[in-house]
Amino acid sequence: MNRTDELRTARIESLVTPAELALRYPVTTGVATHVTDSRRRIEKILNGEDKRLLVIIGPCSIHDLTAAMEYATRLQSLRNQYQSRLEIVMRTYFEKPRTVVGWKGLISDPDLNGSYRVNHGLELARKLLLQVNELGVPTATEFLDMVTGQFIADLISWGAIGARTTESQIHREMASALSCPVGFKNGTDGNSRIAVDAIRAARASHMFLSPDKNGQMTIYQTSGNPYGHIIMRGGKKPNYHADDIAAACDTLHEFDLPEHLVVDFSHGNCQKQHRRQLEVCEDICQQIRNGSTAIAGIMAESFLREGTQKIVGGQPLTYGQSITDPCLGWEDTERLVEKLASAVDTRF
């Protein structure tokens, strides 16, 4: 008999279950309280109950745990300094959606060499999230598929669905099950209506198939996620200007949704020029000073060192510098956060 299945599978390897990994790296009572409390604070900001600004900031992607922890330690200092005005959350992205091909993130390829030691990558990701939360810094990530989130979602305070997946039915269903607030990016073409559709879908109850914490395929019934929101990330042109935000709020109002959103300073809004994030920041700060209540949060890409670098076999990497999108350096990060806090002063 001719084989009709697995014809293009090159390798199959056993994967640790989420339950097994959680036993190795368990959530402590203190971390559980921290995650729960930070989620509640974020929800209040997104609902307009808290006038502070949500600031999701950090490296484009995590590739070096030592550098990530140094960044988290510095970020905790900024959290303490500006906690009356800002809710600062660290961007901890372990999976990278690629337009074509490329390094897909720490979980898929922790050794940066195509060896795909996924079990090791999952361990590193969970270990880092525990350490960052233990510092008192909430974490944010993108949920890229239906499986990986099972290993880390209990340690995440804010999640994102990316521009390439906001229109995907299974991602909307997954968002309806997530325990944290979830932002939906507008499409890569700049269309924010698909993000509004995603918010509406994620608020509803859904049924979908997914492995549970023990790896058993399961039928999930969700209750819906009431904390979905738009992330304005630009497209072929930026969409962070006041008229863009007003148009998005009009669409939210049309469907009786909270008129609060997050603005991404990077990606289409900086036209892939990382230093333009500072220009976007200036514009957003002015909108806040002018009385905008729609801007509930921002996203920015920053790391210890400015820019980006390529992975070259046999050559050491520059410590604290991105290997994916270029980021702002630490001094610019401090300036950006200070400007945001100053602008938010006008809300009080």
Where are these regions (language model features)?
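Internal helix-turn-beta structural module
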Residues: F303-T346
